[in-house]
């Protein structure tokens, strides 16, 4: 479902083209606004079978935003569904951009990103402890191995890589250039 506001007023004068492909779902949204209008889109997805289920945790690894031809001034993303008090969500938007802000809510998580550039990506990476209800209702999808240690190691590696890239790009490279 897609809804829109233009300059703070709700509008139904939008056209949505949805294309399914092997890479995912592509939405194109057209509105009758004018140059300079502030357009806010709200896209609501009811998604099933998006989690990888392990014996100890359920894992979300999803790129809800990728391959855009225009940048976004601001993105707010909500993830609800499993008990947020028991899991952890990490959001990534590349090595050099401002880190997304993740806030735990009573029903899930709120992710906020400022200035996501054209062709930028937003990755959501989360885990929740496996529950007996989730296990019982999804036996066919359950992987018979643990994953929490690997998940946490991957997050630590991402954080370390980001710090290293930023150090090289913002500290070492400028020092090398200044030394010539």
Task: Describe the residue ranges of each PLM region.
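Hydrophobic, helix-length membrane anchors
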Residues: 148-180
């Amino acid at each position: 479902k897609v809804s829109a506001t233009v300059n703070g007023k709700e509008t139904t004068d939008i056209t949505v083209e949805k294309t399914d492909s092997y890479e995912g779902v592509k939405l194109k949204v057209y509105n009758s606004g004018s140059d300079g209008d502030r357009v806010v889109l709200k896209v609501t997805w009811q998604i099933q079978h998006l989690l990888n289920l392990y014996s100890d945790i359920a894992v979300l690894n999803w790129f809800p935003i990728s391959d855009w031809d225009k940048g976004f001034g601001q993105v707010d993303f909500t993830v609800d569904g499993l008990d947020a008090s028991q899991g952890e969500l990490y959001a990534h938007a590349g090595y050099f951009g401002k880190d997304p802000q993740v806030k735990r809510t009573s029903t899930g998580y709120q992710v906020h990103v400022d200035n996501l550039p054209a062709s930028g990506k937003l990755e959501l990476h989360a885990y929740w402890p496996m529950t007996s209800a989730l296990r019982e209702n999804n036996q066919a999808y359950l992987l018979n191995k643990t994953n929490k240690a690997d998940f946490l190691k991957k997050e630590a590696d991402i954080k370390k890589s980001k710090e290293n890239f930023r150090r090289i790009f913002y500290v070492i490279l400028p020092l090398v250039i200044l030394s010539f």
